Amino acid sequence: MKPDRDTLDEYFEYDAEEFLVSLALLITEGRTPECSVKGRTESFHCPPAQSCYPVTTKHECSDKLAQCRQARRTRSEVTLLWKNNLPIMVEMMLLPDCCYSDDGPTTEGIDLNDPAIKQDALLLERWILEPVPRQNGDRFIEEKTLLLAVRSFVFFSQLSAWLSVSHGAIPRNILYRISAADVDLQWNFSQTPIEHVFPVPNVSHNVALKVSVQSLPRQSNYPVLTCSIHTNIGLYEKRIQQHKLKTHQHHNPNEAEQCGTNSSQRLCSKQTWTMAPESVLHAKSGPSPEYTAAVKNIKLYPGTGSKSDHGTSQANILGFSGIGDIKSQETSVRTLKSFSMVDSSISNRQSFWQSAGETNPLIGSLIQERQEIIARIAQHLIHCDPSTSHVSGRPFNTQESSSLHSKLFRVSQENENVGKGKEAFSMTFGSPEFSSPEDTNEGKIRLKPETPRSETCISNDFYSHMPVGETNPLIGSLLQERQDVIARIAQHLEHIDPTASHIPRQSFNMHDSSSVASKVFRSSYEDKNLLKKNKDESSVSISHTKCSLLGDISDGKNLVPNKCFTSFKNNSKEKCSLKHQTRNQCQNNPSEIIQSTYQETQNKSSSLSTSSILSQHKENNLDLTSRFKEQEMSNGIDKQYSNCTTIDKQICTNKYKEKIINENYNPKFFGNLQSDDSKKNDSKIKVTVLEMSEYLNKYESMSSNKDSKRPKTCEQNTQLNSIENYLNKDNEGFKCKKSDQLKNEQDKQEDPTNEKSQNYSQRRSIKDCLSTCEQPKNTEVLRTTLKHSNVWRKHNFHSLDGTSTRAFHPQTGLPLLSSPVPQRKTQSGCFDLDSSLLHLKSFSSRSPRPCLNIEDDPDIHEKPFLSSSAPPITSLSLLGNFEESVLNYRFDPLGIVDGFTAEVGASGAFCPTHLTLPVEVSFYSVSDDNAPSPYMGVITLESLGKRGYRVPPSGTIQVTLFNPNKTVVKMFVVIYDLRDMPANHQTFLRQRTFSVPVKQEVKRSVNKENIRHTEERLLRYLIHLRFQSSKSGKIYLHRDVRLLFSRKSMEVDSGAAYELKSYTESPTNPQFSPRC
């Protein structure tokens, strides 16, 4: 026979050994880094926060997962120490990122006895779990309480704060060490630690567990972690600076005198590569496993040079592939090699944050000192990089943007601000795009600065004039795999780099460049933010136009997402070859040109520049241009257009065909287009846009007749030779065939004034245009307005019990007024109550009231129909009123809503475990006017056992009610004192919450019955608690907890002069009754 639990002093929810393992796993895996807003998570091995929650999917450990292997190792170590009655010590520390892996809290592959690790590691926490003799006394805590306290400490720890502010980016190398709590085995803190001792629970009948933790004081900045291997990099940096100065003086001593001798004193934001903070990058897109593993495991390989996998071309874009000896600097050319850390100058770092508005200074402060080491390594890597670049005549000054991520060395932008009022755009290159020889051999670019040497001497510290040297192929194969890893990381970072540079670029000329793959021109935030600052157009002449670059002559407000930007000068020679070029374009890639008719319809001020530039492209650049334009749209227009049918493409193409046939040889039109493009005058642009819109309106009728014929393709028609010249980004006049046919005849007869007004009305979003394009012909677009919930009241809804109601939803039967039941938005735009949550039961076939057809009686609509639903006044005896009838199930519910839950807890002499239990919520139809009643909820406690939920003899009971959306509906707090309750007795408490006028004072008399005589107060919430005492005098909540709650929240009522007041009542004569 099972002994009565009351005969025992206490019971234990956990086995002592299992509880200890749960604590250790919570400490070691309770803040596992992850790429999210929270930055960390609890692993599957941690004990659940709420033991009452059902375990949906139980985790099964696998030997293939490193975390599972580590958890198994932790379990075995803790168990072994506990069986030997030894105190357990868990130390948490950080390791430098340069020479240690970041696979998480694991010790695999790491020798913890290595003195180098002990020297490099930063100890953050030291936990001691020590068994002590059993604690005796009235005041004790349960194991669950200690588990909650440890979880709270872990949640608010310093490590959790770092992970949270960096969204899981830093720190990455977290190491946990489990050992016996011996003084000789303890590692030392860098500062005096802060100690915290937790309450001591009994884990068995003989043993209690004492848990204490020592932690490092809170740090304002992320600590500097330097490993013993790389502490001598500062020597390299000094030698590099001396060598740079020597080389620079050898080539141009005059410039060296002007620029000074100390490179550290010439940190200029326009001539540095600023390191983007890791956490800023990962805040938007977390690091992939490939990224983190690759970046963190970059080692320093010795060597004297390398043959880059970029190929043997001398005009490669610089990509950092490895580190070499200092001697290799004598035999290699560095055209792009300026590098500086964000934190190398305080003012420089602040200006960087101001220019990159998306960065967070808090994150930068955390990793500021950490990146100092990375900067030195990167500085060394720059001078040891084997890549070469042929510079024609003069050094090319570079501007490196903040998109350079830590340990990823690539050139993102090449620029300099050199002119007096000159402003230029730049090209953006990433090293992974030139990872194949065929790409780089075709993409050789010779750069010729337009500025004299005297203007570029300001940044002579950041480049060197070294002759073109021979690269050493001996370590090329060694660095090949490393370069591939960096290329993949760079490609990943191209899409998630949030930082930007606002510095204008230097103008340069392009020579001998053939068709470069379109992947070179990748989108970057640096150039977009650059355009916001540029108010003028820079002039860059491109010889032979080998590389097709799109221009933007806007005022900086209308942006085109850019792969690379420049603007072009118009010349007569290019005008002459306009027809031939556009004809070739149409013959080669008609489908891409057709797509561009939609892709180029967003930006008005950029449209004329784009059309004139595209007309100057040569035949060998068409493929690049088309690909680039397809990537250009920033608002998903290209994606939307892909949903259009082939017929729609042909329709749009035919409209342009008709326009081009009549306008292709119109020199006046070309003159207007070229004039507006070159002058950059807003008024001229508007005139040209209007003129093009008039042409569209003029020939839409002609195109509509041929659209009905639906020709198969337009690829073979040479009449499309000038499509690119008529792209108008303000057009919406490229409207789809459906809209064109509806307005065809009116467009013919409209005068210019009407055309202008129509042109203005057509300036809607391109998304509307595309959605209209997808509609069938001769189909009207139906607009459905958002319906208010009162619309449902107009339906004559008959409930299942025979009553007609206008107060409940016609489909779900739920109350129409604001309800705790979650809403969902239907396809029609109306908000319905979720019918999936509704289950109807216990319907009465008889109706106590006649059927009211309110809509048929017009007099009722003119008079306010006052609700007579209970409780109007709770002034009579309890028997027979609404409150007692509902609480005692005298009403049949109209329906039951699933999904409500409640958290039940208590506090007093001890704190029992909080429970989360389901709540059965029902509603009724009780009034003559069918007004909805309050909801009733029942929390069943029978699942906890025959006795129920044990609570202290006196204290507070808290019941928090959640709706199916897990939103708090009401929190009930009931203060009670049952210390006088005899054994084997029972009683109840009932707390009512009323809404009463704010200015009216309720006068309390000796007789509590008078409280209920205020006519203006309304019952909003009620909770009914049942208590019973065991034979030993312990108090339990038993059977169930019953709730009444309002249809809508009254705490934040709209301007009502009411307040909520609660009153708790209990039986008085007798106060306690014997148990049955």
UniProtKB/Swiss-Prot annotation:
Residues 878-935 are annotated as: Required for macropage invasion. One of its GO terms (cellular component) is nucleus. Residues 700-721, 739-765 are annotated as: Disordered. It is found in: Nucleus. Residues 24-32 are annotated as: Transactivation domain 1 (TAD1). It comes from the Eukaryota. Transmembrane segments: none annotated. The keyword Transport does not apply. Residues 962-970 are annotated as: Transactivation domain 2 (TAD2). Residues 739-754 have a biased composition (Basic and acidic residues). Keywords: Nucleus. Its main location: nucleus. Belongs to the ATOS family. Transcription regulator that syncronizes transcriptional and translational programs to promote macrophage invasion of tissues. The protein contains 2 transactivation domains (TAD). Each of these domains may be required for transcriptional activation of a subset of target genes. This is Atos homolog protein A.
